[in-house]
A protein has these predicted regions:
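Nucleotide-activated donor-binding/catalytic signature segment of Leloir-type glycosyltransferases, i.e.
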Residues: 1-10
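Short glycine-rich donor-binding/catalytic loop of glycosyltransferases
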Residues: 27, 43-57, 66-69
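Acidic donor-binding loop of glycosyltransferase active sites
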Residues: 14-33, 43-44
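Conserved acidic donor-binding segment of nucleotide-sugar-dependent glycosyltransferases
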Residues: 6, 62-69, 78-83
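C-terminal alpha-helical cap of glycosyltransferases
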Residues: 102-126
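A short acidic/histidine/glycine-rich donor-binding loop in glycosyltransferase catalytic cores
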Residues: 44, 59-65, 78, 94-95
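A short, well-ordered alpha-helix in the C-terminal region of glycosyltransferases
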Residues: 71, 85-99, 111, 115
């Protein structure tokens, strides 16, 4: 376990990529950005149930009951020792998180406006 502070984006991506798994048991996170960041570079994720983590990680993350250290240890052991599971989490996780890329989100927002009849490329909106 390493507690790091003031990590730049490039170093953070390298740390995620070099990790065997991201363990994210937080219950008080907002969206779960670390989950998406880890999955985007191919790092399997174990996260707590009951927050926005399920949206961030989808079905390609292993979820644990909050404050259950035995379950957490069991799931860490599972990810460390089941290569087929790890590779599946890596492959499907990378595919899943593409939905959170900036250009995909921007495209979806533009389409929402179009569906309600607003062309935000019109100069009136700037």
């Amino acid at each position: 376990l390493h507690l790091l502070h003031n990590i730049d984006n490039e170093e953070l991506a390298a740390l995620y990529h070099g990790a065997t798994a991201l363990v994210y048991p937080s219950l008080h996170a907002s969206f779960g950005t670390p989950i998406v960041e880890a999955m985007s570079v191919g790092t399997p994720v174990i996260a707590a149930k009951g927050s926005s983590h399920e949206e961030a990680g989808g079905s390609h993350t292993i979820y644990i009951t909050p404050n259950d250290s035995n379950e957490l240890a069991e799931k860490i052991d599972l990810v460390l020792n089941n290569e087929e599971l790890r590779q599946n989490m890596i492959k499907r996780g990378k595919q899943y998180v593409t939905r959170f890329r900036a250009e995909v989100c921007a495209y979806n927002i533009l389409n929402c406006y179009k569906r309600i009849g607003i062309d935000i490329t019109d100069d009136r909106y700037f």
